[in-house]
C-alpha cells in the first residue's frame, strides 16, 4: 500500500477513536457557534476538562497513539481519527490523466471561515495540497510538496460540498508536476499547480517507522533527508 492507503483492517480501538474524533469535531463546531449562557459554557468546560483528564490518565506518551495510526486515519483533511479534519471523502478516478486523478469532497463549516459566509483561503490551499499529495503518490514514487501555486477564481461558500480534483500533469526525473481544481457545483472556485519532489524509499520508511511526536527527528533521519535533496 502507498503512504495514503490503509494496510490493515480497523480494530475496535480504531473505531472508538473515530467516534471520539467525530464527537470532538462536533464539539469544536458547536462551541464556535453556541449562544449558551456563561454558566452553561462553564459547565460544559468542566465536562471537557474531565474528558481530557480521563484520556491523559492512561496516556502511553506524547503522540504515541497518533504515531501508531496510519496517515489515512490522522490526516488533517480526511483522517477520520483527526477531529480537525472535515473529513473529506477521497476517491480515485482512473479516467483522468496517465496515472488517474483523486477527487475529494469537502464541506467546510464555521471554524474554517474567512470572508463572511465563505472559506478562508488558507484552508482551500491546504486541501489542495492534500488532494495533490494523494494524486502524486499514484506515480509509485511519492514525494513531498516543493511548490504550490493557487489561483482563486470565486469565493468558496461554507456548508456547500466543494469538489476537489487533482492529477499528475507530467513527471520529469524526481519532479512530479500536478494540477487541480475546486468547484462549487458548476462554479470554479480555485485552481492549482503543484510541484512534488520524489523522495528515496528509505526516507519514507523512516518517516513511517521512526515517527515520534515527543522528540525531533534524529541525525539519521536528517541524513536521509539530505540524501534525498542531493539525488
Per-region residue spans from a language model:
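Hydrophobic beta-strand-centered segment that forms part of the acyl-chain substrate-binding groove
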Residues: 1-8, 130-163
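Residues located in well-ordered beta-strands
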Residues: 89, 149-151, 163-167, 181, ...
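Long amphipathic N-terminal alpha/beta scaffold segment
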Residues: 41-113
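A conserved, well-ordered hydrophobic junction motif at loop->secondary-structure transitions
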Residues: 103-127, 134-137
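Intrinsic-disorder/low-complexity, polar/charged segments enriched in Ser/Thr/Lys/Arg/Asp/Glu/Gln
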Residues: 99-103, 147, 161-163, 177, ...
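HotDog/MaoC-like acyl-thioester-processing domains
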Residues: 1-60, 156-158, 169-231
Amino acid at each position: 500500500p502507498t503512504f495514503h492507503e490503509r494496510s490493515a483492517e480497523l480494530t475496535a480501538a480504531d473505531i472508538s477513536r473515530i467516534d471520539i474524533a467525530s464527537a470532538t469535531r462536533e464539539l469544536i463546531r458547536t462551541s464556535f457557534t453556541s449562544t449558551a449562557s456563561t454558566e452553561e459554557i462553564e459547565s460544559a468546560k468542566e465536562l471537557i476538562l474531565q474528558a481530557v483528564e480521563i484520556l491523559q490518565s492512561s496516556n502511553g506518551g506524547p503522540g504515541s497513539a497518533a504515531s501508531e495510526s496510519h496517515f489515512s486515519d490522522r490526516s488533517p483533511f480526511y483522517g477520520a481519527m483527526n477531529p480537525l479534519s472535515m473529513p473529506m471523502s477521497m476517491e480515485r478516478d482512473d479516467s483522468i490523466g496517465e496515472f488517474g486523478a483523486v477527487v475529494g469532497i469537502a464541506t467546510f463549516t464555521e471554524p474554517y471561515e474567512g470572508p463572511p459566509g465563505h472559506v478562508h483561503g488558507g484552508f482551500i490551499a491546504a486541501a489542495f495540497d492534500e488532494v495533490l499529495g494523494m494524486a502524486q503518490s499514484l506515480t509509485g514514487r511519492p514525494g513531498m510538496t516543493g511548490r504550490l501555486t493557487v489561483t482563486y477564481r470565486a469565493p468558496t461558500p461554507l456548508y456547500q460540498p466543494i469538489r476537489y480534483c487533482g492529477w499528475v500533469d507530467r513527471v520529469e526525473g524526481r519532479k512530479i508536476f500536478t494540477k487541480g481544481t475546486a468547484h462549487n457545483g458548476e462554479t470554479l472556485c480555485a485552481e492549482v499547480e503543484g510541484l512534488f519532489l520524489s523522495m528515496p524509499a528509505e526516507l519514507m520508511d523512516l518517516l513511517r517507522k521512526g515517527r515520534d511526536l515527543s522528540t525531533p527527528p534524529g541525525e539519521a533521519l536528517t541524513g536521509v533527508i539530505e540524501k534525498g535533496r542531493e539525488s
